[in-house]
């Protein structure tokens, strides 16, 4: 039996999963719903990819059950893939991605200079205050 490598994300466990012990987490989130055909097609791709990246948390949000979470991410169409690194949303895009595209996206997200990303977020916050 294969180990379930994806986590069901809810508003109850969201902070714990996304921030982790030290807020250094790398999380991919698949926003989906049972009635959504493309979501069902993307699910095995998401699962297979999760097996190849044990250091990344692959999480799924059932947008029907978790409407508040879906609203918080401003999800307008599904599936939508979001990537959070160190507590920062670094990518969000609707559409069922082919496996190669998903792998490429993960590689790009791994290469991000998070110090730079955090500096950018801080600068953005400063202009809003």
Summary of predicted features, one role per range:
Residues 1-57, 64-129:
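Proteins that catalyze or organize thiol-disulfide redox chemistry
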């Amino acid at each position: 039996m294969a180990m379930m490598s994806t986590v069901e994300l809810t508003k109850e466990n969201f902070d714990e999963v996304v921030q982790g012990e030290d807020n250094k987490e790398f999380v991919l989130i698949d926003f989906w719903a049972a009635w959504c055909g493309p979501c069902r097609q993307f699910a095995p791709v998401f699962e297979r990819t999760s097996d190849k990246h044990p250091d990344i948390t692959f999480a799924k949000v059932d947008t029907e059950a978790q409407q508040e979470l879906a609203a918080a991410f401003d999800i307008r169409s599904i599936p939508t893939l979001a990537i959070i690194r160190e507590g920062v949303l670094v990518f969000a895009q609707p559409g069922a991605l082919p496996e190669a595209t998903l792998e490429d996206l993960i590689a790009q997200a791994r290469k991000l200079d998070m110090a730079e990303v955090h500096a950018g977020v801080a600068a953005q916050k400063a202009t809003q205050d």
